[in-house]
């Protein structure tokens, strides 16, 4: 299969620039992958698609305000850093602008001097390893000085940065939000739990590679970025019990899917507590191990995420669903509407 097989025309005005006032007021396209039937609903009605004994699996990662603006200590010239991942201790891999002026040994100061960094290594493509120096707790300093790194297709400024976090976000480490979870409110989750559905949390820290376009024609040549994931023993035990009792594992978003399927692939279809790095690429032809249904937002043309959804529901049905959504003026991407596929 080729990348072009997953292309579609998306009018730019359908790219949501801001979140809706109410999280669960977004639209929900329900797709039956067996019959091809589609229903236009609102997100709150996802509760009608869940049965007692099912497990709803969510990614509890929290987005870091990972964009930092500072000055070179020597010259006072402006520097922008985007934190990518914590490599060890206080060292981080970052994207730097302007990178060519940041040599090993360059010192950078941020804000009122509560945070500083020194470049320890030069990488390719504007990448650097920097070591941060600070007082108190790093994440607290970052929360006060950093800005949220919104996706490249969002041009509006975000008034409330919590709207780019899920209501259950707690494990800091992502460069982007697991956006399928943005639709849930605490009230809706309480209703779902009261129905007898198990709420299960895992962690996958979303990397910036999630926005990287596929640059090859042949899908077999595409290399996925790696992301850190973690599933606790308690969560794994709940999911095993759900499966044993005939319930479904319903994933919220592609990050939850990739974590569950990574673990299922690693342990011959069994669900076990695990942590590590995954670069799983789920595309048509993939044999599913764990996930029975899922919700997800609407993704970019030719993206690996459209390919993942197509692996579950079939390429033609997914493209039909996308064309339907465009005709019905669904909102796309991170702050957009959602679909539920079962």
From Swiss-Prot:
The keyword Cytoplasm applies. HAMAP family: QueA. This is S-adenosylmethionine:tRNA ribosyltransferase-isomerase. One of its GO terms (molecular function) is S-adenosylmethionine:tRNA ribosyltransferase-isomerase activity. It catalyses: 7-aminomethyl-7-carbaguanosine(34) in tRNA + S-adenosyl-L-methionine = epoxyqueuosine(34) in tRNA + adenine + L-methionine + 2 H(+). Its EC number is 2.4.99.17. It is found in: Cytoplasm. Belongs to the QueA family. Pathway: tRNA modification; tRNA-queuosine biosynthesis. One of its GO terms (biological process) is tRNA wobble guanine modification.
